[in-house]
Amino acid sequence: VALVLDIHHHWVNSGEYISPTDDRFARIIDSWRGVRPVIHYSVSREDILIGHPTNVQPDMDILLAGEYKKAKLRAHSDYMWNNAVNDWALEFLQYADIMVESKAKNLASVALHKYYTENKNELSKQNVRQKASSEQPIFTPLW
């Protein structure tokens, strides 16, 4: 059985932005038995995190200390509005395809793809710095 990692729901449940080089994700990749895996990606609703900076990943501990509840944070946004979270999610493209879960469906996927293509050089530089010692295979996105 091939397992699918939902990175948003993992964050909601644990407060952790899991790394694509995490051993737990490696086990998920292995469950696909040579086929390129898929992950699910969504972001908390824009109308829940009103005023949150788009260049800062939401911090679960801070949100829970405020008026936010996990049940509300679980809900999918219309678009992938947080670029810091997008940058993190796009790190997974080296290892898996990304299935966008959002209210705006294909429009959100197209917008994320546009963000990726406009920023992939900078994202690649960040990934090289972060993973200089990694020996994980690098895949080409299928977009």
Q: How should these model regions be labeled?
A:
Residues 8-12, 39-46, 101-105:
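Active-site beta-loop-alpha junctions enriched in small/polar residues
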Residues 1-39:
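Acidic/histidine-rich catalytic cores of soluble enzymes
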Residues 35-41, 95-98:
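Hydrophobic beta-strand segments of well-ordered beta-sheets in folded domains
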Residues 44-51, 139-143:
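Noncatalytic linker/hinge segments flanking ATPase motor cores
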Residues 13, 69, 73-87, 96, ...:
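Sequence termini and other peripheral, non-core segments
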Residues 17-19, 54, 113-115:
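Short, glycine/charged-enriched secondary-structure capping and boundary segments
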Residues 20-34, 47-94:
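A short, acidic, amphipathic alpha-helical segment used as a generic capping/interface helix at domain edges
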Residues 2-3, 7, 64-66, 122-127:
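Glycine-rich loops and low-complexity Gly/Arg-rich segments
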